[in-house]
């Protein structure tokens, strides 16, 4: 099992912190365990409340069912069903920018 460094950033929320996240744990769950409050609703990859945008690195979000191909290509990620697959940087609180 690999453990990756996931940097979570959101200027509007004053958030810029790096967490450690195993490659078999969702980013949202790891953030919560480390005391970081991120938005979420369904926790199943079926809505957009937890949306973020990967600006560096890669994630595996094969469990998601909400984002379309264009949103995926643009780097959007649902943190509730995303595993890190490298060290990465994720802009959080991106639900509004999806639309």
Swiss-Prot record:
2Fe-2S ferredoxin-type domain mapped to chain residues: 4-96
The UniProt record lists the keyword Iron-sulfur: yes
Gene3D superfamilies, per the entry: 3.10.20.30
Biological process per Gene Ontology, one example term: electron transport chain
GO terms assigned for molecular function: 2 iron, 2 sulfur cluster binding; electron transfer activity; metal ion binding
Primary localization class, coarse: plastid
Any matching Pfam family: Fer2
GO cellular component: a single term: cyanelle
Keywords tagged on the record: 2Fe-2S, Cyanelle, Electron transport, Iron, Iron-sulfur, Metal-binding, Plastid, Transport
Residue positions binding [2Fe-2S] cluster: 42, 47, 50, 80
Location of this chain's protein in the cell: Plastid, Cyanelle
Note on cofactor: Binds 1 [2Fe-2S] cluster.
InterPro entries: 2Fe-2S_ferredoxin-like_sf, 2Fe-2S_ferredoxin-type, 2Fe2S_fd_BS, Beta-grasp_dom_sf, Fd_pln
Electron transport recorded as keyword: yes
SUPFAM superfamilies, sorted: 2Fe-2S ferredoxin-like (SSF54292)
Function: Ferredoxins are iron-sulfur proteins that transfer electrons in a wide variety of metabolic reactions.
Classification via PANTHER family: FERREDOXIN, FERREDOXIN-2, CHLOROPLASTIC
Record's subunit section: Forms a complex with heterodimeric ferredoxin-thioredoxin reductase (FTR) and thioredoxin.
Protein name: Ferredoxin-1
Species this chain originates from: Cyanophora paradoxa
Lineage: Eukaryota, Glaucocystophyceae, Cyanophoraceae, Cyanophora
């Amino acid at each position: 099992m690999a453990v990756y460094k996931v940097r979570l950033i959101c200027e509007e929320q004053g958030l810029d912190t790096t967490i450690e996240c195993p490659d078999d744990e969702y980013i949202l769950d790891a953030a919560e365990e480390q005391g970081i409050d991120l938005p979420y609703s369904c926790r199943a990859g079926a809505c957009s409340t937890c949306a973020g945008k990967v600006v560096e690195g890669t994630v595996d979000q094969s469990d998601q069912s909400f984002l379309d191909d264009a949103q995926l290509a643009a780097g959007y990620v649902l943190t509730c069903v995303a595993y890190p697959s490298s060290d990465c940087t994720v802009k959080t609180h991106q639900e509004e920018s999806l639309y």
